[in-house]
């Protein structure tokens, strides 16, 4: 009692956040810190459309404090939510640019890693590859 469940689809399967009766909102993994986004650039997103809708919804939320899993607690989540949206849109534009000529999935992934100067390892291949896969 006193806890509101907030649906946060997109980043992973059926993710949820919680608002407590003292107006603290726990946002789970629905957004990342600027530092994380700047370092890794491309994270795992299960459903990009749903993820962007979730970020737009989060951007409009009001609470005493927001507690994301991958960022510092804050009283205003708007700027961080917008940064996450902007990062996703920038990457989407880069993917469209890369796909101007036909190529296989692995080549697209390679070009994306090269464009963002990322190091390919198994973990990154799985996370980023899962995000890019249709």
Label the predicted regions:
Residues 94-134:
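C-terminal regulatory/interaction regions
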Residues 2-92:
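Metallo-beta-lactamase
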